[in-house]
Regions:
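Soluble, non-transmembrane catalytic domains of enzymes that act on hydrophobic metabolites at membranes
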Residues: 116-118, 122, 127, 147
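Mid-chain, well-packed structural core segment of small domains
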Residues: 80-95
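Active-site recognition of the HExxH zinc-binding catalytic motif
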Residues: 99-116
Length: 180
């Protein structure tokens, strides 16, 4: 069964958005999509009163779990991914749209997987499980999308990853020194 994509947004997304969504979902095993009914593209997400969220934040995506007889579905806000103000903000958002959409969609799909299909994940472990799932499948999606730039930088990836880990470690140590 294929996941349906509905566009309820007044914001015009890039023309191949549906193909992008299908390519992102193709990077995830088909069993992990079991039960996911649809993906809805909207302008902004208006959470209902059951969801506690700080004011002033704009959700890029929201997962709606199974409720009664309705199957689970995902909602993605194009207003958060494609801002309407400022030429350079709009340009940067259009250039990064594919990657941002992949991150949001894989995060929502990870929530679906961890809440409905995966067993043994406790509430306290949910955020870490979703993050690791998203990173794993984002990496595989990015590798499948790789053009000439990806092929050129592939030999340098291990070195760049080690450098990023050392910078992250140094950042965490500095953060501990400042708070401690």
């Amino acid at each position: 069964m294929s996941v349906k994509i509905e566009n309820r947004a007044s914001i015009r997304p890039p023309g191949n958005t549906e193909q992008i969504v299908h390519s992102i979902l193709d990077s995830v095993p088909r069993e992990h999509l079991r039960g996911l009914g649809k993906i809805v593209l909207v302008d902004t997400i208006v959470p209902d009163n059951r969801i506690q969220m700080p004011s002033g934040t704009e959700l890029p995506g929201l997962y709606h779990p199974k409720f009664g007889s309705a199957s689970p579905w995902c909602e993605i806000a194009l207003g958060a991914l494609l801002p309407r103000t400022g030429f350079f903000k709009r340009l940067a958002a259009r250039l990064n749209f594919k990657a941002n959409l992949a991150g949001v969609l894989l995060s929502l799909q990870a929530q679906h997987y961890c809440l409905t299909i995966a067993h043994g994940i406790r509430k306290g472990q949910l955020e870490g499980a979703v993050r690791s799932y998203t990173e794993k499948y984002y990496e595989s999606w990015r590798e499948s999308q790789g053009g000439i730039r990806a092929r050129l930088f592939r030999p340098f990836r291990p070195w760049l990853d080690r450098w990023a880990r050392s910078l992250r470690k140094r950042y965490e140590q500095e953060k501990k020194k400042q708070t401690g």
